Amino acid sequence: MKRKLLIVNSNLHTGGVQKALAALLANIGNDYDVTLLLFYKGGACLGELPDNICVKEVNSAFRYLGMNRSDAKSPKDKLLRAIYAGITRVFGRKYAIALMGLGQKKLSGYAYAISYIQNGGDKAFYGGCNEFVAKHVGAGKKISFLHGDYRLCGANTALNAALYKSFDAIAACSQGCGDSILAALPELGDKLHIVKNCQRYDEIRARAEKTAVRLEPEKINIVTVARLGREKSVGRAVEAMARLGALQEKIHYYIIGDGIEKDRICGIIDEAKLGDTVTLCGSMDEPYGYIEAAELLLIPSLSEAAPMVIGEAACLATPVLSTETSSAREMIEDSGYGWVCENSVEGLRKGLEMLISEPDLLREKSKFLNTLHFDDSEAAGQFKAMLDRL
């Protein structure tokens, strides 16, 4: 008989955590009796789930933690979501969750219960899966996944620490993420497991072929795929390119994504007169054609955990240049996928200048990536080994 496994997540809107979850389910669905419980049953990644996964939605106010503003369509949902968000921002998430839990029946009968997305700060209207699994699920063993840098994402609070201590295991998606939480909570050392993200590489390659584009053949084409938020710091990449002088003529930079920083980035482009060098492409559900066509994937983030786009680029033979973040050296330099630079505008400038001045470095790295074999056997094996050890 297959062991019963409950995985709790907020929603399946497009994002790194959601893509990793869909890929994990594709790899483990035949080995366990899996129920995926979503706070809000919506999002583009719903269509990527295998048929053997039972997908349910909570029947309580926890659903508002899974909704974004556009999901709340009825007047009732808009009002209640606003009320819970307001309580969270004024008094803290624990008070909102206490109210949400009043109508939530306890679930039981599972060998393992997994909270797949971490919390943010105590007043961030985000997460809640840790609390749900800890307080509203009965299971033999409980596991919390960590997809962020614990010390830098706002999660390093007494409330979150107490929650993590209540779990039987913590699954960090990279060694860097694991090291970050252990630096704050060393007592969790015996509970920590490294479980890398699954990626479904064959699907990535197929989608790249389906969405193929032709970029400027006489240029070094550089692409960034990111939400345009402050932590992604895409504006710094544009500032670095403004400092390249005559080397600007050798490149074209494509920014795929949208967000609150878009207007500021447009201002930097205009001020630096980079309109012919930088193209804002907007959000794309399928950026893989651009990634494959580019000579370089650029990650200019102030902070990152283990971005899925690194593996996506590597399996498409596109080298990566990233600022130094918690997992960058582990995932990019140690793997041979590319280069890591100082986390600053000047560090980005130097890294770009080196690669633009010596394009053979990019060509040789791409050839190397083409020799590698990419599959999810290691990541799926780590997940299964963790469950077997508990």
Where are these regions (language model features)?
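A conserved mid-protein helix/loop that constitutes part of the nucleotide-sugar donor-binding site
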Residues: 18-23, 220-243, 253, 260-266
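Nucleotide-activated donor-binding/catalytic signature segment of Leloir-type glycosyltransferases, i.e.
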Residues: 266-282
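Aromatic "clamp/platform" in nucleotide-sugar-dependent glycosyltransferases that forms part
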Residues: 283, 302
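Conserved acidic donor-binding segment of nucleotide-sugar-dependent glycosyltransferases
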Residues: 334-345, 354-359
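A charged, aromatic-enriched C-terminal amphipathic alpha-helix characteristic of glycosyltransferases
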Residues: 360-390
